Amino acid sequence: MRKKIIATVIGTSALAAVTWTNADAATTYKVKSGDSLWSIANKYNMSVAKLKSLNNLTSNVIFPNQSLKVSGSTSSSTSSNTSTGSTYTVKSGDTLSGIAAKYGTTYQKIMSLNGLSNFNIYPGQKLKVSGAASSSSSNTSGNTSSGSTTTYTVKSGDSLSAIAAKYGTTYQKIMSLNGLTNFNIYPGQKLKVSGKASTGGSGSSSTGSAGYKTPVFNHSNLYDWGQCTWHVFNKRAQIGKGISTYWWNANNWDTAAAADGYTIDRKATVGSILQSDMGYYGHVAFVESVNANGSITISEMNYSASPGIVTYRTIPASQVSSYVYIH
């Protein structure tokens, strides 16, 4: 009997040792599609604030396959949050508008300083936040000027708002110059960036939204990664019409936007936000084009595909007015 008791004690001690080792080893978590900081924090019985502190996160944006510390001491911020003089080292979750707000500048200025042609940045990247603009010799090869008209050849990763910022104009002006009715551009495409507008505006009237009230926010994207709200926030930032990051679930967006001073109606325009109260959380999408037959084309996430995947859908003319639009 005595021997059995001793064996039981030893076995229990060994089990405890094994359990401790496994708990100590489980200090990181690999993000899966659909995860959010809240769900991960809840899984490990910690607060979102603690999880963000452990990983030096400045926003709620996370990415699939990203490794997050879920236990241990807070990461030293000296290596990842470096800001020496006029340069800044990008951290996970950063956006150009967020960095610009931190340094009292604009995202267009940062793009110009670093020769950026799109909004894509990555952790560890060093960005100039003050000083002289980067040499644009590498970009001039795609630009031609003939008389009073200047053209630009689109490169991979370009957006209309980025091109507009580069030439000190607006994306609406470029759309008008080239007779564009949506934001879709492709590498190799030649765009007029100055001169006279193209004739035959067969559908460009959809961009005529001068009467709309459209405040602009320079917030970081705090919406859950891959959701419809996350996608629309990014799309609006890309066209220079940033929205608030505090509108919460999609079914609250029309009320929150109206409170912030945006025009809300049932008329779709290119670049407006389609909003619906369908489902438990509601849904939002980005209006890519208003078509000649009265239908509209929208882009969205987490509607007919998994979170993080952009899909496109055409809303028939007969259904367009059944949705609310934020301008």
Curated annotation (Swiss-Prot):
This protein's UniProt keywords: Antimicrobial, Bacteriolytic enzyme, Cell cycle, Cell division, Cell wall biogenesis/degradation, Hydrolase, Repeat, Secreted, Septation, Signal, Virulence
Family matches, as InterPro entries: CHAP_dom (IPR007921), LysM_dom (IPR018392), LysM_dom_sf (IPR036779), Papain-like_cys_pep_sf (IPR038765)
Region (Disordered): 68-89
Enzyme class: hydrolase
Gene3D superfamilies per UniProt: endopeptidase domain like (from Nostoc punctiforme) (3.90.1720.10), LysM domain (3.10.350.10)
EC number(s) on file: 3.5.1.28
An annotated GO BP: defense response to bacterium
Reactions mediated catalytically: Hydrolyzes the link between N-acetylmuramoyl residues and L-amino acid residues in certain cell-wall glycopeptides
Broad class of where this protein is predominantly found: secreted
Keyword set includes Magnesium: no
LysM domain segment(s): 27-70, 86-129, 150-193
Gene Ontology MF terms: lytic endotransglycosylase activity; N-acetylmuramoyl-L-alanine amidase activity
Annotated GO CC locations: cell surface; extracellular region
Role played: Peptidoglycan hydrolase involved in the splitting of the septum during cell division.
The protein's name in its UniProt record: N-acetylmuramoyl-L-alanine amidase sle1
